[in-house]
């Protein structure tokens, strides 16, 4: 049997390593029907995001896919052939993104950003949602139900409170903060 040695050199620094039980994933991330190898790099930065080194399985062994490593807190949406990402930018800003795998390179398809409007009346917290930089809604113009139907509900365009966004590491979500839970 042939053996391939994969050399991984830690980059980026300041990673908090995860336990060995949650270090490795063997799952198809380029949607070719063949499982690929993911190695968790640990938690990074003050927002605690997780990343993975990615090695795509080929006829000749494993080939590194460095663009996957840039995807924070990944989840796999096999049905739509997307890699999903969610993270906290800061205390008053969150983002969700969809990536497509094109020729074994992961490319940002679209990004939803939730930010607090710093210029709004100080008596009211106003949230603003944008997709790829274009405003799609504001909490001072939409009801709670309309906001849920716009981005949160399972049947909304984004469905960010839905199961498809559950992360590889701990099956958590940003919307309920379970993304920060221990697996």
Language model features: what each stretch is:
Residues 1, 17-31:
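N-terminal "first-domain core" detector
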Residues 47-66, 98-103:
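Beta-propeller blade repeat segments, especially FG-GAP/WD-type strand-to-loop junctions
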Residues 29-41, 79-87:
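Acidic/hydrophobic-patterned starts of short beta strands in beta-sheet-rich repeat architectures
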Residues 4-6, 53, 95-97:
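Short beta-strand segments
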Residues 6-8, 64-69, 108-113:
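Beta-propeller fold detector
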Residues 43-46, 90-91:
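Short glycine/acidic-enriched loop and turn motifs that connect beta-strands
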Residues 8-23, 68-78, 92-93:
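Repeat-based blade/solenoid architectures
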Residues 80-183:
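Acidic, small-residue rich beta-repeat scaffolds with periodic aromatic anchors
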């Amino acid at each position: 049997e042939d053996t391939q040695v994969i050399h991984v050199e830690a980059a980026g620094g300041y990673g908090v390593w995860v336990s060995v039980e949650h270090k490795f994933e063997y799952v198809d991330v380029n949607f070719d029907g063949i499982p690929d190898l993911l190695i968790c790099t640990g938690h990074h930065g003050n927002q605690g995001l997780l990343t993975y080194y990615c090695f795509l399985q080929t006829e000749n062994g494993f080939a590194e896919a460095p663009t996957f490593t840039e995807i924070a807190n990944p989840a796999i949406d096999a049905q739509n052939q997307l890699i999903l990402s969610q993270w906290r930018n800061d205390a008053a800003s969150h983002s969700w993104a969809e990536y497509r795998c094109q020729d074994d390179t992961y490319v940002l398809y679209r990004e939803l950003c939730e930010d607090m409007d710093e210029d709004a009346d100080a008596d009211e917290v106003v949230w603003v949602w944008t997709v790829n930089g274009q405003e799609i809604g504001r909490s001072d113009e939409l009801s709670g139900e309309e906001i849920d139907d716009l981005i949160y509900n399972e049947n909304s365009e984004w469905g960010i409170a839905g199961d498809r966004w559950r992360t590889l590491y701990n099956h958590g979500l940003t919307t309920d903060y379970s993304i920060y839970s221990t697996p």
